[in-house]
Design a protein with these regions (language model features):
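A structural signal for small-residue-enriched, beta-sheet-centric alpha/beta enzyme cores
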Residues: 2-45, 68-85, 91-92, 112-219
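Short amphipathic alpha-helices in soluble, non-transmembrane regions
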Residues: 97-107, 201-208
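Short active-site-adjacent helix-start/loop capping segments
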Residues: 49-51, 73-76, 96-97
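Tubulin/FtsZ superfamily GTPase core signature
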Residues: 59-68, 99, 105, 174, ...
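N-terminal low-complexity, intrinsically disordered segments
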Residues: 49-59
Length: 219
């Protein structure tokens, strides 16, 4: 497997609830006064799904009301459709749910994914750049909709070395860090700055992760 070959996410389920029970809406973070319908997805990669959910908010009148990674990742899933994450979008209009789900699927199939950081793909890296944030990840990062952001993820030591390299390689600031362990035992960070700067930071992050994989005990 070539280094930095795409590891495409697998979409495991896409379902709609056009008229959800108010109790269910409330339980999953929706507001029955504003939301009537839900769209649900499960995927075997969590971070690309967070990106896809955010993308949906830019193209459809939907809110991301629930999105959680599952403990220990997709290799330890509770069932064949569980994957690594459940994401839920909500709207008052079933057609908006449909539009949002279409964006989510398209983003997962053609945009956001992990990459192999070594020859056998046992180390994965997510050096993703969002040119314009939607309403979901902007809140999570403490940024404004429309701002660029680098969304960086890797295993613990690789991510730590990579984040240091990214911060030194470009004029970016650390908007939020997720030290290990996360639910999936990775580590992550959001970096803010001008688009070309976050792109440079993401590239430096990926390169550093690859180098750590090649030389894990370098002095």
């Amino acid at each position: 497997m070539p280094v930095l070959e795409a590891l495409l996410p697998k979409i495991l389920s896409v379902r709609r609830i056009p008229g959800a029970d108010p109790a269910l809406l409330r339980a999953y973070g929706a507001d029955p006064e504003r939301h009537r319908s839900l769209g649900l997805v499960t995927v075997d990669q969590d971070d690309p799904t967070y990106v896809a959910l955010d993308e949906a908010t830019k193209h459809a009148r939907v809110d991301v009301v629930y999105a959680r990674s599952f403990y220990a990742g997709s290799r330890h899933a509770s069932g064949p459709l569980s994957g690594e994450i459940l994401g839920v979008i909500a709207s008052d209009d079933p057609e908006e749910i449909e539009s949002g789900l279409e964006v989510i699927v398209r983003t997962l199939e053609h945009d956001a994914c992990f990459y192999a950081a070594n020859d056998d793909g046992s180390i994965a890296v997510f050096p993703h750049v969002i040119a314009s944030l939607g309403t979901y990840l902007s809140v999570a990062a403490g940024l404004s909709p429309g701002e660029p952001m680098a969304y960086l993820v890797a295993p613990p030591v690789e991510a730590t070395i990579g984040l240091d390299a990214a911060l030194k390689a470009a004029e970016v600031r650390l908007a939020r860090a997720f030290p290990p362990p996360t639910e999936t035992n990775f580590a992550a960070a959001y970096l803010a700055g001008e688009l070309h700067q976050v792109e440079a930071a993401a590239m430096a992050f990926a390169e550093a992760v690859v180098q750590v994989g090649r030389h894990p005990r370098e002095r």
